[in-house]
């Protein structure tokens, strides 16, 4: 009996999770938005492709979450994130920023997490032919943060 109930609930559970297409077309609940940003942060190509559509309806807080997710995905799927950044840089989005913010936001505060992120992202961008601008921004901010840290000591 329990199996029958579980099987009957399965379609409702599956339908409750948004897809990139449905997320781009429909209004998202806060839990759907969290799900979408988690998928973007994981570097999921389908969800990366939905970012420009999500950016159109994002408020400032949601845009910040999307930028954070893109930055997290950068060392995981640099090619996919760079394609999204290229689209964002070429367009006009109410609240979203592109390369200048996403490529640098994880290294603006010194520390081990920033250092680890810098190393992984730098390596990923060196392997990606289209990553020069992002790499240039990343390295510039990283050097500036390190110089400020050294001057403060």
Predicted regions and their residues:
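Positively charged n-region of N-terminal signal peptides that target proteins for export
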Residues: 1-4
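Extended alpha-helical scaffolding segments
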Residues: 45-48, 60-153
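N-terminal secretory signal peptides
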Residues: 17-65, 150
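N-terminal signal peptide c-region/cleavage motif recognized by signal peptidases
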Residues: 11-16
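Hydrophobic alpha-helical transmembrane segments of integral membrane proteins
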Residues: 7-8
């Amino acid at each position: 009996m329990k199996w029958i109930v579980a099987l009957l609930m399965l379609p409702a559970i599956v339908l409750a999770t948004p897809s990139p297409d449905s997320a781009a077309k429909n209004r998202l609940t806060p839990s759907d938005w969290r799900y979408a940003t988690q998928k973007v942060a994981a570097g999921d190509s389908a969800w990366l492709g939905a970012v420009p559509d999500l950016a159109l309806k994002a408020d400032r807080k949601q845009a910040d979450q999307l930028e954070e997710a893109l930055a997290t995905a950068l060392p995981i799927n640099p090619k996919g994130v760079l394609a999204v950044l290229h689209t964002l840089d070429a367009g006009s989005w109410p609240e979203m920023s592109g390369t200048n913010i996403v490529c640098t936001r994880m290294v603006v505060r010194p520390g081990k997490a920033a250092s680890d992120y810098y190393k992984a992202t730098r390596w990923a961008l060196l392997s990606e032919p289209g990553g020069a601008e992002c790499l240039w921004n990343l390295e510039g901010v990283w050097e500036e943060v390190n110089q400020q840290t050294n001057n403060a000591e």
